[in-house]
Amino acid sequence: MSDAAESSESSDWVTRHAVRAACRSRLVGLLVVVALLAGARHAAAQQPGPVPVDSISPDKAEFLPRSRFQLAANSLSGGDPRFTWDARFGGSADVLDYHFGRLGIVGDYEAVVGSERRNFDVEQGLYILEASTSGRIGANEVAMVFHHVSRHLSDRLKPKATAWNVFEGRYLRNLDFSGTQVAVVAGVGNVVTHVDVDYTWNLNIDINVRHQISPRVGLYARGLAEAFGVDPVIRGRTDPQHSGRFEGGVRLHGRGGILELFAGVEHRLDADLHDYIPVTWGIMGFRLVNK
């Protein structure tokens, strides 16, 4: 065999080895993030927001008619050592359905994982807590919501807390277009208290589109957008600040839950608690949801 052929084979072997090593590294990273979330589940009531519902309780009130829980993790592109993975564990529950509306609670824990000090370094922890009451008008639902967000640094000095509370009006609706399900959640609120942020008001919308291909497989696309008004006295910013996320993928149905595999893009305002600058990432990950 010629030296050129041997060199070519050696180069191919190195390339294949590097690709396999990179894949193993990403897989190990995803498993570590899941483990971090599983261990963190006792630290707080970690739950995502409420979703529109089609089935309502009978004329009499019903206690705990429904609940929803999720575990999710996704990679963050860009190579910034502060932002490598993003992961969530949480759920929501309707404590009481009184037929013409419901009382609900929500809690969510998010871990932002970087690689500054070690391969998997939890840099930020974010808690969301909500309480809401709603009323139904036909197929529409309107809710009053108290929404709390608290952001923390992990293993890092931060003398001042970062938190805000929003009193919000929210609209929820399910739509059906020839078998394609569309869930719409939109809200507008006033930031009633805040610490170390300049937010004054909030607008948000969440649109989730799903289409079932077979009993076991479906497709989905989801878009979320959020805007905050700001107080120029605090940080000198005058224009509203924006966040957004779009993801799409497949939904694999099992007897006890649903696995979503997705890819997309996210633009997050004030991603770093020191710099308060927006960051845009490509994302790829999974989500487990109970039925």
Segments (PLM) and residue ranges:
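Cleavable N-terminal export/targeting peptides
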Residues: M1-P50, K291
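Transmembrane beta-barrel domains of bacterial outer-membrane proteins
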Residues: Q46-K291
